[in-house]
Each structure stands twice: as C-alpha cells, then as structure tokens.
Amino acid sequence: MKSQLRKKTLEALSALSNEDILQKTERMYKYLFSLPEWQNAGTIAVTISRGLEIPTRPVIEQAWEEGKQVCIPKCHPDTKKMQFRTYQTDDQLETVYAGLLEPVIEKTKEVNPSQIDLMIVPGVCFDVNGFRVGFGGGYYDRYLSEYEGKTVSLLLECQLFAHVPRLPHDIPVHKLITEDRIISCFS
C-alpha cells in the first residue's frame, strides 16, 4: 500500500510544471515563515531537497538571513541511524549514496536533538493527522522517537490523503503546511 501511494504521489508531482511548483511553494513558504514555531526557533533542522521533493533551499536561505542555525541530516546506513549536523556553507556538503547531499563530518558539528527548535520533516505523502509515508528508509521515524521539539512538513495538496498506512512506530508531525493551508495535527 505504501509503495502504491508513493508511486501515485510521485506521478502527480511529476505532472506539475516548474511554474506551478514555484507558485505553490512560494505560498507555502509564506505560511511557514509566519508560524510562531518558525519565528521563535533558533535552530532549524531541514533536509537538502532533491528531485521531486519540496525545494528546501529557499527555507535554508531564509533561516540564514534571519540568523538561525541550520542543521541537516547525516544518515548512517550501517546503523540505520541519523544525526543532524551544522550547515553554513556548501563546501560542507558531500554527495553520498543515492545522490543525497549530506554534511561532511570533519567540517561540521553534531547538533543534539534537544538543541533543535523546529524540524522540517520530509515525506512523499501525508494524511490529515500528520502521519507520513517517506522514502522507505525509516531514518526519520527512528529519529523522531527521541525528538521532543516541534515538527512541520511542507507538502502540496496533491500529496495529502485522508489516510496513509501507519505502523505502531510511526510518529506524526505537529503541523502540515500546503500551498493552501496550515493543518494542526495534534498538540
């Protein structure tokens, strides 16, 4: 079921023009930057987007412009764990498996979960309760089980479903932000 939802959602995203995506994400970013969770955050955790993911570069640049610390994930496939590390310049990045851009350990510092004020959690599709279908690695679900801060996800309306399959270890995000609205999932 998850793989079918992933496929359906990625097909819908592929059908959008670059202009559509740009217009929709600009509205989404305005919602994000207006949230108290964003405005009060000193440290933001976010991925470096690629492919059909919601572009995160504008989010990173806005955070830097506002003097916020940005941290990005470093995945450890051998342990299936993830950590967040500081990110200030592109020379701190390296291309790893599957073409992902991740922080270079020697050029960055680890950020403890308790230091992250707001985490922007990626996903392929979501339901209105904040549950998500990711890319299948389980890294975020494992990390979120130990993270107590605020979480939001950025998505287009075509990525939103009434229900997505969930497992007992799945953890919902607090808020979903689309091009049309902010959905508070739970408190």
Curated annotation (Swiss-Prot):
GO biological process, one term: folic acid-containing compound biosynthetic process
Keyword annotations from UniProtKB, A to Z: ATP-binding, Nucleotide-binding
Keyword ATP-binding assigned: yes
InterPro entries: FTHF_cligase (IPR002698), FTHF_cligase-like_sf (IPR024185), NagB/RpiA_transferase-like (IPR037171)
GO molecular function, one term: ATP binding
Statement: the UniProt record of this protein carries the keyword Nucleotide-binding: yes
GO cellular component: cytoplasm
Positions bound to ATP: 2-6, 134-141, 170
Family per record: Belongs to the 5-formyltetrahydrofolate cyclo-ligase family.
Protein known as: Uncharacterized protein YqgN
Organism for this UniProt entry: Bacillus subtilis (strain 168)
